[in-house]
């Protein structure tokens, strides 16, 4: 039995989301190095980023067309403007979009299982299409609510999958 089939996904809510500007740390990962993503989060100066809006965090996955299975990942926060991005921080503009929004249940270390269930079970069964990304636009977004505790790895986490209109 695959790991994806052990995850019981609730039906997602479909929601139109406004555009966001997310600033943070960005790195390229491969399937072999994706276990290093938590180290990127540990380096993020959360709460100290100029013009940070709120206490939510975003993990933005994009440029996943790499033939090696690689992808770019940005660990960041919403900011009010680009001028606030300093040092080794970078930003990504997330366009207004319709999303299928899934609630992840459990520890953050099991998030990959939820994502696998979304891609390999829900998406084929839903007969929906993922939005074809333009260069640099997100292919999936992790949303960490204010109650997410990075020390325990628990709290509200959502996975946003951009859909074709």
PLM regions with names:
Residues 1-165:
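A solvent-exposed interaction/effector surface
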């Amino acid at each position: 039995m695959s790991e994806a089939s052990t995850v019981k996904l609730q039906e997602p809510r479909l929601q139109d989301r406004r555009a966001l500007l997310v600033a943070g740390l960005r790195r390229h990962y491969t399937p072999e190095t994706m276990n290093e993503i938590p180290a990127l989060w540990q380096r993020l100066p959360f709460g100290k980023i100029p013009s940070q809006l709120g206490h939510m965090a975003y993990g933005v996955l994009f440029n996943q067309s790499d033939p090696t299975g690689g992808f770019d990942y940005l660990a960041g926060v919403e900011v009010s403007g680009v001028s606030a991005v300093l040092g080794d921080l970078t930003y990504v503009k997330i366009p207004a979009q319709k999303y299928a929004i899934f609630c992840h249940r459990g520890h953050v270390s099991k998030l990959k299982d939820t994502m696998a269930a979304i891609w390999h079970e829900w998406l084929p069964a839903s007969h929906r299409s993922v939005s074809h990304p333009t260069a640099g636009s997100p292919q999936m977004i992790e949303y960490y609510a204010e109650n997410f505790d990075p020390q325990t790895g628990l709290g509200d986490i959502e996975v946003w999958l951009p859909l074709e209109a």
